[in-house]
């Protein structure tokens, strides 16, 4: 379809820009990536998170912890940025040149638990309007 504005995760922007499909690389020329809610009194842009944890009764706790430590290590975080256009969660890791070229943004600091609390009502609204 056609539209004036769309909401996407930023990493799709990078995937389109560097796609092996020439049509997708052409599409990106008509797109502008913006981060909403960036004014002085605005809340900032929503950010997605990926969580990890170790199950209480895990038989391999040491291995699970080692995996989580690797995933947040500078080497792994660099790969996330270079391959999947994701921002690092490790503050010791700089964003890639591509991510930096998209500009700085203020992130929404709403606690994730609040989002979870509001999700059922949000779903009702989505269902009601047929989105």
Provide a role label for each language-model segment.
Residues 70-94:
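Periplasmic-binding protein-like
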Residues 95-131:
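Extracellular/periplasmic bilobal clamshell ligand-binding domains
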Residues 67:
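Substrate/cofactor-recognition hotspot
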Residues 12, 60-64, 76, 122-125:
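Stable alpha-helical elements in mature extracytoplasmic
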Residues 47-60, 79-83:
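A bilobed periplasmic-binding-protein/Venus flytrap-type ligand-binding module shared by bacterial periplasmic
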Residues 39-44, 85-104:
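Short glycine/proline-rich, acidic loop/turn segments that cap or connect secondary-structure elements
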Residues 11-14, 38-41, 59, 73-74:
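Solvent-exposed loop/turn segments at secondary-structure junctions
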Residues 1-34:
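Ligand-binding pocket segment of bilobal, Venus flytrap-like solute-binding proteins
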């Amino acid at each position: 379809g056609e539209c004036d504005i769309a909401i996407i995760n930023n990493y799709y922007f990078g995937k389109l820009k560097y796609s092996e499909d020439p049509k997708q690389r052409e599409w990106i020329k008509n797109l502008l990536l913006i981060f909403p809610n960036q004014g002085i009194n605005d809340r900032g842009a929503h950010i997605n998170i990926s969580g990890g944890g170790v199950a209480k009764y895990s038989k391999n706790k040491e291995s699970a912890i080692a995996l989580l430590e690797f995933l947040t290590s500078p080497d792994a975080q660099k790969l996330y940025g270079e391959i999947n256009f994701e921002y690092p969660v490790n503050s010791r890791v700089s964003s890639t040149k591509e991510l930096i070229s998209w500009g700085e943004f203020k992130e929404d600091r709403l606690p994730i638990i609040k989002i979870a609390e509001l999700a059922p009502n949000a779903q009702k609204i989505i269902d009601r309007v047929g989105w």
